[in-house]
């Protein structure tokens, strides 16, 4: 069986216009996949040079396959049908290592056609590293490497304003573009680079903050033999991902034209502020996960897919989203409902086995950040507590018993909560404290909740009633009236 290369698999090759820091699965099934579609359907005509930003020889370089690799996108489409689509990606030309090919790395700045910089160097990638110097070959941190590359471009083109770059980080931190820009400016000042360069950074370059959303499941180790048999070739860089994707970019409106999104619309939004989209994702996608997990798991289910195929649990989650979360969010309702519909479709994806226990990690913090704001906003708006979000809190407290049908399961959270719950549930079993007292102790933890939740009218009583129902009847019976 042949291995992918451009000689045996000839096809389009595009001029290099994009630098990409990061060779991982996510960028290849997200950014490079989108660039490939735009190259095919428009005159974007842009090839990607992947820069490996860390010193590692594993995985091997994409250049061993001349930049070629296959994405397999699978999940439920807009009609709810299971689809699996294999695509040979030709947008990547080559990969270089900034550690072993530093001169080649700097030379990227000399190419007048270079226009975009994408990156995903993990959440820790956009950070300051004390001691990074201009003359390091290379510096340690990604922002320092980028500063050096930008200065190379500024110098090579004598500060030409038409030679700036559009810089689009995909790291999962809030306002990643702003954070990256601040660090680049910090290095420029630390290294005493000319004032003209600092002005050029602001005048000629755009740092765009982003929200990225796609579950990328990466190399399909367990299915490789079967998939390669179907494809008819060997691919060491096979990359799998879900059908859904969303790319929100906070940047100039002209970006839509530059990326040719006006000619071939993708699920890419160019916006003035990513904040409402971030809030939407946290509240609907992450919030639904967090509400679902303790309810579904204690109802005897193990994966998100099983939960969504269970009529009662699915109804509970959908009503929580549409009746209690969406009404308190600050975006047009049709946009929110469209996003919610995509989310529930993603939860049903038969190709992804998302274990409920893995999502349950740090459940107390997740509840505070993902559900509590909507619970409190709903109570404020209507004067009554949202029934399902409140029930989800009771289910979460019950989950920390660590026992289902007589069998124990691992609960992962910070030591404070694990010890606290062990003590509280032990006291409850010994009838030292009642359910309402247990709930009041949990809700009074100001350091965690950032307020005293026992002061929210009716919250202790309702959570305690729900918790008693769960303990006395079991999760199935307790949740049924809310389905």
From Swiss-Prot:
User: What GO terms describe the biological role, i.e. biological process, of this protein?
Assistant: D-galacturonate catabolic process; mannitol catabolic process
Q: Does the keyword Transmembrane helix apply?
A: no
Keyword NAD included in the entry's annotation = yes
Entry-linked InterPro entries: 6-PGluconate_DH-like_C_sf, 6PGD_dom2, Altronate_OxRdtase, Mannitol_DH_C, Mannitol_DH_N, NAD(P)-bd_dom_sf
Keywords assigned by UniProt, alphabetized = NAD, Oxidoreductase
Q: What pathway does this protein act in?
A: Carbohydrate metabolism; pentose and glucuronate interconversion
Which EC class does it fall in?
oxidoreductase
UniProt name for this protein: Altronate oxidoreductase
